[in-house]
Structures are given as structure tokens and as C-alpha cells.
């Protein structure tokens, strides 16, 4: 089995980690950063940019630069959270044929899974570059409060990216693994993981116990809000700036996508700066223009103002904390440590609110940006069999059940049940001679089924005629370690059964996933060709530059015919460089190398004679001559010979 990497697929930033022995290592990306912006840009020429390069060009390409796509994954277009985002995002969110929320980019519809796969592919490549070997297996984290559809969609994104997702684990649980593994305190400890990221909020109460030398991490409860995070904080700042600018200039920036993209960057920057200073300037020259000329934006913002804008958002995190503590069967005083995860927890007001609720200072020895990826890597090591001193007992975040007579939700597995788990219950028919039953599966806490998230439905057919209440239909629920649900129904009288892995009544079909995997592989082939073309072009341009330089220095030593031949080869090469034809560039490059061979010989002979002439010119020249001697060796590179100066 190869190495299993740990990936934190975040709303705003993503991170990848690997275990080296028993030490986790967060891997720097190609730009040298330990986290990668979860931003994907689709260029006109078909190139896909991911991370910092996508972020840099967002202002000039707002409609085709996608961020915070995690907020759409596994969601229906009609959900109120999606409808809210439609009015805020510069890119186009559209309904897919199956009812999911997809994104339209350059006339093409993309699922949130495909866009997430582009980010995962970047994480995979980051790990491969570091390890120097292919990576095919990963543990990917999701918010603890993600429902079944969102978990399944994340797993599908991994498949599209070419990864075998060995486990989906909850972000707070991963952070607890990263925190608790190296702690030497004896006895059981209860910790609260408060995870406020770019798009989601989770709170988990976790017990870390030493059981016969094994660290056992048991999730006691979890709660949260999958549509609350840093993006919402940014939006409050953007709305404030728009209102202030409208008051000052009379211009409304709400419908100007270029201005909105600049405002988003400025809001994020101001939010970060105000975590460390009491005031910041938001300065955006030439933000827009009207008949009177260009307009400049300059607004001072204090930390107090920011806190007043986002106070209600921070307050919204406290109710889930209260529920999680109650569901865990503990009191706030029983909690030993509070861990903060997610970039938003750097905000002083957030830390203050957490301290106020839990009655203790949150721990400062956990990196909020990296802990989740580190925990995923630890779980990867456990799954690969390289570690046996860790046991992770996670829970299902929401109750699961089926719709029964009168539209009631009959709960089969209650929220915060440790997974994996199985449960079966016997039901009967509602009408006489009913030939089939439809099993409708829901996830949520409402008593009426329609108030919960519909996960899917299937039929059990061929029930023999009988009066209502006679047939015995056993419905079984089985949640695997990824938190993904499998449901079965069996007629006890006939032995007939039907089983499905619940895929949301939206979600991607197997055929769609296969097609997306194929598309991704084709893109990878295109990317490879692009890189090879760029390398050929760079090599040819370097050759032209080198030969031109040498021709200027030694051209007078060649006869006219040879010189003309080289000049013609240079001209051919320059013409080829104007095209996108890699084969032509390589052919002309080879021709130029051949044509300039005589020039190389003249240069070499000239150097030899100048070195011989300088042979008696004292110790310094002798030393230079000694250094130059290896040039006679067959392994000498042309470029190195050219660097030797004439005596």
C-alpha cells in the first residue's frame, strides 16, 4: 500500500499533510506556501489555474474565477442557502438537470464536485512533488455537520481527482487527533473543538482516553452550521463599504462585478489586519467612474466597527455550542481544553466569545490552519496499518430515519450515534393488499419528514396480497465509517429484499463520475503537452539567444557561407517560435544546433589559443589555465565553455 495523504479541503484554503515516521509534515505547495487558496480560474484558452495564481487574476476575470464552492457541494439549487449565494457571487450558479446547484463557466456547466476535484488535484500534485512518487490514496476531511449528500459529493470529488478516498473524517475530529496525540497528560480528558472556517462552523465535544496504551478519541457530540463562516464575515464588510461609498459618492457598487471582486479582496485584508490592529484603511483608487470622472474609495475602519458588523454572526455559533455540550451529557465545567480551528478563530472577538461561553482560555498551541490536515494524515497512517495506538470513534451528526404514515419522520439512528453502526426495525403496510412499499429516507431533527433533508428513496416490490398491518417489512440502516448510509428493506414473509447505498435524489450518477474522471485525465494529458511545449519553446529561445551572442563575438572568424547558414537557421527558428507547433520548434532547434557547430569549433579553438598565450603570465593566469584544462573532457557543457574569459 502507498502513502495515504491527509487533505483538508477547505472553503477558503486547503492544506495537505503526510506522516514521516510518527511526525506529521504539512507540505508546501509549488509557491512555497503551506496552505493553498481554494480558488479555481478557468482561462479563455482552456487552462485551469488553482490557488494563488487563480486568486491573483480574480479581479480581471471575476465571472470565471470560482471560490467558496464548498458551500454548494451536495446542495440542491432551490435550497435557501444557495439562493442567498446567487445574489452575492460574481460567478453564475445554475440548476443542473438533477436539481443540484452547479456553476456555469464560459458556457459550460460544472458540478461543485468537478471544481473541488481541481483543488484536490493540486493537493495531490503538491504531495507527489514532495514525495517523488505517485499518490493515489487520501483521507479527506469534511465539516462534522455535513449531511450524507455532502459527504458523498466530497468522496466523488476525490474520485474525479484520481484519488481513492480511504476515509471521510470530520474536521473537528481531525483537529482533536492532531492536538491529542502528543499530549502526555494521564487520564481521560474532554475537549471542545470550536471550528469556524471560511464557510462552515462546527463544534464537537470529544473525549480522549488512554485505554491499555492506546489513545482513544471518542466524539461525544457534534453540532454546527454548514453555511456560516469567514465568507459571511467578509460579506458584512463588503456591504458596509458599499453603503458608505454610496453615501459619499451616490454610486452603488452592488452590480459592478469588477468592483465587487476588488471589494472582496479588500474586505478579507481588512478583516485580517483588524485582528492585529485597532484600525485599518481601505483604499481602492479608481474603483469606478461616472460622467464626472473616476471615483476613488477611501474608508477608515476600526476593530470596534467590524465587531459590531459581525456580532450577530459570532453569536450564532454559541447556540450550537450549547446544544453540543447538552447532547454530550457534560457541563461546561467538565471540559478540560478548548481548541480553536479555522482562520476565523484568529479574530479577538471570536476568542473572547468562546472564552466567555466555556469559562476558560482557548489553547494557543494548535495551528488553526493546519491541524485538520495533520489529523487527516494521522488517520491515513492508521488506515495504512502503520499505526495501531490510535482508535477514532466518530458520530453521525444528524438523525436518520424514514417517512411513515402521516408524513411522520420515524428516526432509525439518532444524532451523535457512534459510527460505524447498524439498526433494523420492522414496519408493515398501510393499506390492504398493498403490493409494494416505498422507503423514503430522510436526515434531520424535525418530527415531520418533509422538514428534513430527503436523501433518497427506493421500492420493495412483490409483497403478497394481505390485509394492512400483516406483512412484516424489516428496514435496516447501516452507516459506514465515512458517515455514508446504506439502507435495505426485506419482506420477512417472502425473503425478498432490496438494498441501496443512499445517494441523494440529486447527486452525480456513476456514469457522470466516470465521464468526469475521463475528462480530468484528458485535461492532465493536455496540461502535460502544454508543459512540454513551454519547455521546448524555452530551450529554443535560449538557443537563439546563445547563438546570436556567439555570432556577434566570433562571426568574423567564419567564412561568409557558414555565417549565412547560421543566420538563416536563426531566422527559421524565430519563425517557428511564433507558432504553437512543438515538433516544428524542436526540428528547427536541432537544425540551428547543427548549423552553429562550426561556430562552436571556432570558439573552442580561440579559447584554447588564448589560454596557451596566457600560460606564462604569472601564477594567476596559471591557476586560470589549470581550471580551464578540464574543458578538454567530453562531458563539458557548451554553456560552461562560453563562460571562460579570453586572456
Swiss-Prot record:
Protein name (database record): Chaperone protein DnaK
Stated induction or repression of this protein's expression: By stress conditions e.g. heat shock.
Segments for region (Disordered): 606-647
CDD domains: ASKHA_NBD_HSP70_DnaK-like (cd10234)
Function recorded in the entry: Acts as a chaperone.
Xref: InterPro entries: ATPase_NBD, Chaperone_DnaK, Heat_shock_70_CS, HSP70_C_sf, HSP70_peptide-bd_sf, Hsp_70_fam
Family (UniProt): Belongs to the heat shock protein 70 family.
Record flagged with keyword ATP-binding: yes
Lineage: Bacteria, Pseudomonadati, Pseudomonadota, Betaproteobacteria, Burkholderiales
Compositionally biased intervals (Low complexity): 612-630
List of residues that carry Phosphothreonine: 200
Molecular function in Gene Ontology: ATP binding; ATP-dependent protein folding chaperone; unfolded protein binding
Pfam family, one: HSP70
Keywords annotated in UniProt: ATP-binding, Chaperone, Nucleotide-binding, Phosphoprotein, Stress response
Origin species: Polaromonas naphthalenivorans (strain CJ2)
